[in-house]
């Protein structure tokens, strides 16, 4: 027995999204019977090939069967609630996962392009930390984080000389993750913009942003904001661990 990723799927949601795209299914109106059958065929194929199936694939299989059975149950008119669709939670998770994949692909392309450019070394500047009180329960969505990233990118580009095509050392996502983790060691939150000097290479900004996306997805950090247009805070998540 050995473990592989069938067609390089990164988990059950990745497989489910692949099936939705392959069969051109409307993600907002999923035909649960057809999709469940296709998903179960993949799971059975993995079993027949003696592939060690991760438990998360089986958990999602059970969830799909439960949703399918709920939708097949007869309902009287009085029982029907248009706001109580058993697919709602699954659709929300699929859309969120799809957004992460799309944004990560775009940022990876940008990082690969910028790896070919050399810019001047960062100048030491004071960080933008603030001591304002804040409520740790105001999370933000991915769109607001993209807007914040664009603000940093624009400011960095204003302070960056035009490119010369010379390879430079690569700043890795692992290094960016370690920087963020270290910043949270002694303080449970910090200002998102304080990560940047605004004179660093743009690829370093992109790498930091990719790291923040991955850490947020893994529950290592939360990304929070009091009100629209105010400062964004990076906060320890439930899975945060230093060292």
From Swiss-Prot:
Keywords linked to the UniProt accession: Cell cycle, Cell division, Chromosome partition, Cytoplasm
Localization of this protein: Cytoplasm
Gene Ontology CC: cytoplasm
The keyword Phosphoprotein is annotated on this UniProt entry: no
Major location category of this protein: cytoplasm
Alphabetized InterPro entries for the sequence: ScpA, ScpA-like_C
Pfam families: SMC_ScpA
Highest taxon of source: Bacteria
Alphabetical GO biological process terms: cell division; chromosome segregation; DNA replication
Function according to Swiss-Prot or TrEMBL: Participates in chromosomal partition during cell division. May act via the formation of a condensin-like complex containing Smc and ScpB that pull DNA away from mid-cell into both cell halves.
Protein family: Belongs to the ScpA family.
Subunit structure: Component of a cohesin-like complex composed of ScpA, ScpB and the Smc homodimer, in which ScpA and ScpB bind to the head domain of Smc. The presence of the three proteins is required for the association of the complex with DNA.
Cross-referenced HAMAP family: ScpA
Designated name of the protein: Segregation and condensation protein A
Species whose genome carries this gene: Staphylococcus aureus (strain MRSA252)
